[in-house]
A protein has these predicted regions:
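ABC ATPase nucleotide-binding domains
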Residues: 1-61
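Hydrophobic beta-strand signal
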Residues: 40, 97-99, 153
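Generic structural signal for well-ordered beta-strand positions
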Residues: 48, 116, 171-172
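ATPase nucleotide-binding modules
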Residues: 54, 58-116, 121, 125-146
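Detector for glycine-centered tight turns/loop "hinges" at secondary-structure junctions
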Residues: 86-88, 166-169
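Short, Lys/Arg- and Gly-enriched loop/turn segments at beta-strand edges
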Residues: 159-167
């Protein structure tokens, strides 16, 4: 296990020292994100996105990229009309999917939600919350006092919202 953790660092140092281009294939997203200058994300043999790790995480080109990169994955909420499916919460713009990273969602906001389950991870707490017909995952501090069944308010800045069309492509 320790060798598996040290190998990406060793390979990166070797690549920089030799100055050669290295193509490294992995199914481990964390490994790819931590080692790469550029990531080519494939889905069934098709390139979903080719970008720096930071761009891949911050500006996913598709819902596949959004849901594949990150732990927990980006929230992808269905939009019906101009609202999050089954709710009165405005989606912010015309789209089919609204996405936001779990760490971009904050507690104590305008969006009513019900905590359906929690995962206590020590420093972090992952809360799964029902918003209308959708489930929204929130990553917050492990000190947060939440319990399944509790009613909470959620919020996110418009700048962290990602919008995707019906085919899963990012809208500009």
């Amino acid at each position: 296990a320790q060798l598996r953790q040290e190998m990406p660092t060793e390979l990166g140092q070797l690549q920089r020292r030799l100055g050669h281009t290295v193509v490294y294939v992995t199914h481990d997203q964390a490994e790819a994100m931590s080692m790469a200058d550029q990531v080519v994300l494939l889905n069934r043999g098709r390139i979903e996105q080719a970008a720096t790790p930071r761009t891949l995480y911050a500006q996913p080109a598709t819902t596949f990229a959004a849901s594949f990169i990150g732990t927990p994955a980006m929230n992808l909420l269905r939009i019906e009309g101009d609202r999050i499916a089954g709710s009165d919460v405005p989606a912010g713009r015309a789209a089919h999917w609204l996405g936001m990273r779990p760490e971009a969602v904050t507690l104590g906001g305008r969006v009513p939600a019900t905590v359906t389950s929690i995962e206590y991870l020590g420093a972090d707490l992952i809360a799964h919350c029902a918003v209308g017909k959708e489930t929204l995952t929130v990553r917050t501090t492990g000190q947060a006092d939440l319990a399944a069944g509790s009613e909470v308010g959620l919020d996110w800045a418009p700048s962290v919202a990602h919008h995707f069309d019906a085919e899963g492509r990012r809208l500009a």
